Amino acid sequence: MPKYLTTLYKRTIKRNIILFKKLGKDFDEKKFILLLIIIAAIPLLISYYLHLTLKSMIIFVVIYVGAALFIPSILYENKIETLENNIPQALYIMILALESGRSINEALLEVVKSNIKEVSDIFRKVLYLMENQKLSFEESMTIVSNLYDSKVLRMLARIMIENRKYGGDLSDSLKILAKTLEDFKMYKRQLLSVTASGLAIGFIILCGVIPAVAALLGAYLIAVSGMLSGVAPIPPVKPEDISKGFEIVQMGTAIIGALFAIPIFGLKIGRMFLISAVTMTIGVLAYYTILKFAPGIFS
C-alpha cells in the first residue's frame, strides 16, 4: 500500500477505532469500514432514484461520509466535556472530606462512592493502581490523567501532585480551581445563550423557509407550464432545472451549516461536517417534499 494511503488509513480508520475503545465501544476496523460503505451507498441510491446531478451525488457522499468519520471524535469530545463539567462537583466532595480530616485517598473514595459521571471512574482507576498495582499516588494520578485528553484533569493532577510533594493546604487549592471552572462554565453558557436565539431564527429561515419558498416557486412554474402548454410561450420546466435547483439548495444549506457551527463549537471540522449534514438534509427534504406535492395545489 502506498505511503500516503497508509497515513490516511491511520488518521481515519485506525484513529477512530482507538477512539471507540476509549469510549468503551466494541467496534473493529471491518465494522467501521462497512458502516462507511453503507453510508456512502445510501446517498448514491437516493441520487440515482431522484435523477440528481453528479455534483449533487458527490456532495451527498462527501458530507455524509465526512460526518461519519468525525462522529467518534465528537462523541469523545462530549465525553471529555462531561468530565470537565463534573469535576467541580467532585472537587467540592473532596474539599469536604479533606476539611473533615480525611486523607487524599479517602477523599478520592468519597468521589467514587458519589457516582459522578466520568469523574468517579477516573478516581476509581487511580485507587486501583495504588491498591492493586502498588503504585504511588503521584504515579497513579500521572498515568490516569494522561489517558484522557483533558487539560482540566491534567491541571488537577498537577495541583494534587505538587501539593503532596511540597506541602500546603490542598483544600484551598481545590476551592480556587472549582470556583474558576464554575465561572468559566457560567461565562460559556451566557455567551451561548446570547447567540443561540439569533442562530435559531437564522437556521429556520435559511435551512427551512428559503428552500420551501424555492420549492413552492418551482411547483408553481411546473403547474403553470403544464396548464398553458401550447397556449403561452412559457418554456416547460425540465428535470434538469429541478436537479439544478436541488443542487443549489443542497450546496447552500451545507455551507450555512458549516458557518453556523463556528460560533457554537469553534473552528472544529468535525462539528462543521455534522451540522452541515443536518442542515443539508433539512433543506433538501423541505425542497423536494414541497416540490413533489405542491403542484397539485396550483392545478
From Swiss-Prot:
Membrane-spanning intervals of the chain: 32-52, 56-76, 199-219, 220-240, 246-266, 273-293
Subcellular localization(s) per the UniProt record: Cell membrane
UniProt xrefs under Pfam families: T2SSF
GO cellular component: plasma membrane
Disulphides: none
Organism field: Methanocaldococcus jannaschii (strain ATCC 43067 / DSM 2661 / JAL-1 / JCM 10045 / NBRC 100440)
Presence of keyword Iron-sulfur: no
This protein's UniProt keywords: Cell membrane, Membrane, Transmembrane, Transmembrane helix
Bilayer topology: Multi-pass membrane protein
Protein name (record): Uncharacterized protein MJ0779
InterPro entries per UniProt: T2SS_GspF_dom
